[in-house]
């Protein structure tokens, strides 16, 4: 369960070459289809998939961004330089190289691409190796799509953790106020929401500012997404509540919308292109049959 300390931070930056393999409900919900036929490579070509894998490993081990860009192609700069923190990028590449050295293997996938798996946990490198006229290269376009799928999956998993944290926050608030609240941010010095600026005599609020500003208030105030999701609190009479989490950008930051009850039971639904509009209109946790329990 997410601890309060996690809610008081902005969270980790999105790492495009993250070393965590996520199960992706989001990918199943996508309708973009399978890999398209290989196109003329924009980066380096290799005689064998093994050579391509060895080349990307060597470049990562040296932290050679110019060589990585040469291997992946000029259009892959957003993949090679995925944030402004050079130290973080170097650290992630070193971890990838260590996993590669520990164990690596290549596997031909059903779509005829070749996937590179590294480490004892068999982490799949997101950029596939594809064939074009007898030569092999990394397809950065397909890799960029896979990276997006993984980030969506990561956001959805984090959204569920945030919902659990908000359930705990509501219960903490109730212990002091003897009532639940639908507000994320308190009004001035009145503790009528889950977040307030700490005062000498006011104690620490149940949630921190970053999550608080991801809350969509009933008055329509401006919100900022937290790890790609917005949140709402539904009050169920005077003795109950539910948490709603929906993606800030459908099919980009997330796919599924979630509703979580006070006991931690969660339900999910793909609300489609009108996700934001529909999610803002949800008024009860008593969902219809289109909502499926999250296992």
Residue ranges and their predicted role:
Residues 10-20:
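Bacterial N-terminal signal peptides
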Residues 27-62, 142-168, 172:
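Short, low-complexity N-terminal intrinsically disordered segments enriched in polar/charged residues
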Residues 77-125, 217-240:
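Surface-exposed, charged secondary-structure patches
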Residues 64-76, 183-185:
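Short, well-ordered alpha-helical segments enriched in acidic and aromatic residues
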Residues 1-12:
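Bacterial N-terminal signal peptides that target proteins for export
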Residues 175-249, 253-256, 260, 270:
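Extracellular/periplasmic head regions of type IV pilus-like filament subunits
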Residues 114-157, 164, 265-271, 275:
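Short beta-strand edge/turn micro-motifs at domain boundaries
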Residues 22-26:
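Sec/Tat signal peptide C-region and signal peptidase I cleavage site
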């Amino acid at each position: 369960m997410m601890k309060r300390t996690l809610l008081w931070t902005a969270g980790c930056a999105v790492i495009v070459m993250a070393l965590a393999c996520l199960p992706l409900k989001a990918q199943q919900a996508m309708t973009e289809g399978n890999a398209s036929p290989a196109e003329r490579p924009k980066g380096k070509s290799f005689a064998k998939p093994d050579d391509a894998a060895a080349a990307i490993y060597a470049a990562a081990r040296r932290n050679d961004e110019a060589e990585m860009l040469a291997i992946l192609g000029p259009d892959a700069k957003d993949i090679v330089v995925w944030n402004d923190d050079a130290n973080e990028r170097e650290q992630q590449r070193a971890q990838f190289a260590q996993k590669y050295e520990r164990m690596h293997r290549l596997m031909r996938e059903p779509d005829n691409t070749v996937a590179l798996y590294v480490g004892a946990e068999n982490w799949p490198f997101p950029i596939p190796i594809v064939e074009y006229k007898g030569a092999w290269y990394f397809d950065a376009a397909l890799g960029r799509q896979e990276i997006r799928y993984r980030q969506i999956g990561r956001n959805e998993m984090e959204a569920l953790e945030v919902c659990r944290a908000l359930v705990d926050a509501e219960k903490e608030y109730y212990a002091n106020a003897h009532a639940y609240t639908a507000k994320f941010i308190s009004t001035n010095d009145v503790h009528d929401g889950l977040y307030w600026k700490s005062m000498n005599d006011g104690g620490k609020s149940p949630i921190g500012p970053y999550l608080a500003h991801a809350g969509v208030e009933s008055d329509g105030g401006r919100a900022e997404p937290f790890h790609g999701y917005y949140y709402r609190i539904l009050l169920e009479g005077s003795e109950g509540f539910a948490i709603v989490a929906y993606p800030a950008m459908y099919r980009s930051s997330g796919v599924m919308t979630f509703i979580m009850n006070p006991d931690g039971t969660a339900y999910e639904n793909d609300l489609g292109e009108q996700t934001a509009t529909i999610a803002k209109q949800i008024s009860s946790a008593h969902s219809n049959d289109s909502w499926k329990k999250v296992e």
